[in-house]
């Protein structure tokens, strides 16, 4: 029974998910259906949390829109997500960056992770 569930989960998981983590700036292309038309909507922001649970993996992205903080949670392997692109790697020392909710301006900045040779 357990093998059947694992096999079905592996079948439904996306293979093209890039490697990203908390602090990284990502652009998530989401399929939005309005009436009978379908289009792609980009959501760019900082990953503040990531949950790794196989098929049930999820991540939360936060951005500032018109001076207001907006957070959106995505299922990593959802068919509604067209693509995930990593724009910038962030250097952080926490797995969950919920403290960014209380911060704004320069104190909410995240240092960039430089590539190591």
UniProtKB/Swiss-Prot annotation:
GO molecular function, one term: structural constituent of ribosome
Gene3D superfamilies named among the record's database cross-references: 2.30.30.790
Keyword Ribosomal protein: yes
Keywords from the named record: Ribonucleoprotein, Ribosomal protein
One of the protein's GO biological processes: translation
Superkingdom to which the source organism belongs: Bacteria
GO CC annotation: cytosolic large ribosomal subunit
Annotated function: This protein is located at the 30S-50S ribosomal subunit interface and may play a role in the structure and function of the aminoacyl-tRNA binding site.
NCBIfam families: rplS_bact
Family statement drawn from the similarity comment of this UniProt entry: Belongs to the bacterial ribosomal protein bL19 family.
Protein name: Large ribosomal subunit protein bL19
Taxonomic source organism: Shewanella amazonensis (strain ATCC BAA-1098 / SB2B)
